Amino acid sequence: TLKNDVLMSFLTQSLDKVYLESVREKEGGSYGVSVYGQLSRYPNDDEAFLQIYFDTDPAKREKMTQIIMNELQKIAQDGPAAEHINKTKEFMLKKHTEQMKENGYWLNILNQYYWYKADMDSNFQQVVESITPEDVKQFAKALLEQNNCIEVSLCFLRL
């Protein structure tokens, strides 16, 4: 649904802000943490995934991974900061206004409607404006309650 897509965007953007503060600025553990979320509409409307990745010193990997999981759990327990929600709303509404001038945006809207009968535009502004920290909290909680987490670490050999 449009609301779930918007909630995923709010969650990923809130995590981006939190990880910038905790992992990069406070711990100096990485230049940046990338967060990507996606909802699947095929074959079901009820599948989602959240991908979080970062580079770090191998000696800091465990600590940084723990910080990343703790921050995600904190949002699922307490919700994101109201400031993050407000900044995300402002950003999303501004970006939407800009995207509405682009053919690619409308092609995607038509594609979503054709394949999934999903109207991803008509109520966009109202949905974005209606999102609360509690909504994002419940969304994050539902993701974590799936208890379906995979951790992958890649360590490169130096020759």
Q: Can you describe what each PLM-predicted range is?
A:
Residues 1-5, 9, 24-130, 148-156:
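M16 family metallopeptidases and their MPP-like homologs
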Residues 143-146:
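Extracellular/periplasmic catalytic domains that process cell-envelope and extracellular macromolecules
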Residues 15-16:
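Short Ser/Thr-interspersed hydrophobic loop/turn segments at strand-loop and sheet-helix junctions
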Residues 21:
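Carboxylate-rich, divalent-cation-coordinating active-site regions
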Residues 129, 133-141:
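Mature hydrolase/peptidase catalytic cores and their serpin-fold inhibitory cores, especially
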